[in-house]
């Protein structure tokens, strides 16, 4: 996502589609810090900030304006083409959304074959992650170290874990799509500023949010995927 922001701001105009409203807000804030609020727009299903002379549009993928003819266009997490609920939107963007001078699709290697078949002239770039992961074994939630994110797979589960952490650790932030934009943003800021050392969230935070997390824990090994309960898979 950092690379996409750099490329967009290198052009006179640009549009970027992101999978989460919270991520769109994060990218919007970064672009405003670099270019100022008078030229950056934010469009999601909940927020709409469009200055009269907007040059850069930061949006959720569903809310992307595809008719403005921007010099640059990017779609993040393009592997969501395979998602049962949102896949049709990402597939439409893959097939039809283009920048006048540059188009960038970011996502997992699982899309390499599809993109090569549909866009044979596309250039593939790999960006290595700088962080490393190591398995720390199972732990009780009350034993989690500071700067931990605990991922739950239902609203009830998230609230129950948050209450347990508040009782045992003194405080935590809660991030879910069901919260209002203002509340979500405030909760992320609470954690990022170090006011609390624990974050409890749904698994949506895995789609590109840049958080200062040293440890990640899952509340279980099964989740409801919209149709059935299933095991988590890598």
For the regions a protein language model found, what residue spans apply to each?
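Inter-Walker segment of RecA-like/P-loop motor cores
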Residues: 32-71
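Conserved strand-helix element at the start of the C-terminal RecA-like helicase core
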Residues: 12-27, 103-106, 143-168, 172-176
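Post-DEXD/H (motif II) to motif III coupling segment of the RecA-like Helicase ATP-binding lobe
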Residues: 79-134
């Amino acid at each position: 996502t950092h690379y996409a922001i750099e490329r967009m701001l290198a052009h006179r105009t640009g549009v970027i589609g992101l999978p989460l409203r919270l991520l769109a807000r994060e990218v919007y804030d970064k672009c405003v810090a670099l270019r100022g609020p008078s030229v950056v727009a934010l469009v999601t299903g909940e927020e709409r900030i469009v200055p009269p002379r907007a040059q850069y549009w930061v949006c959720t993928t569903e809310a992307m304006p595809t008719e403005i003819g921007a010099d640059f266009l990017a779609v993040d997490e393009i592997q969501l083409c395979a998602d049962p609920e949102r896949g049709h939107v990402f597939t439409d963007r893959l097939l039809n959304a283009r920048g006048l001078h540059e188009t960038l699709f970011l996502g997992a290697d699982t899309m390499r074959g599809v993109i090569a078949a549909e866009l044979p002239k596309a250039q593939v770039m790999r960006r290595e992650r700088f962080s490393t992961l190591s398995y720390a074994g199972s732990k009780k939630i009350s034993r989690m170290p500071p700067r931990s994110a605990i991922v739950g797979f239902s609203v009830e589960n998230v609230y129950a874990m948050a209450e347990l952490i508040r009782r045992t650790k003194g405080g935590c932030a809660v991030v879910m799509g069901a919260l209002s934009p203002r509340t979500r943003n405030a909760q992320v800021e609470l954690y990022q500023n170090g006011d609390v050392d624990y974050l409890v969230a749904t698994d949506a935070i895995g789609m590109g949010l840049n958080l200062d997390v040293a440890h990640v824990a899952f509340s279980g090994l099964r989740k409801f995927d919209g149709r059935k309960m299933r095991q988590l898979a890598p």
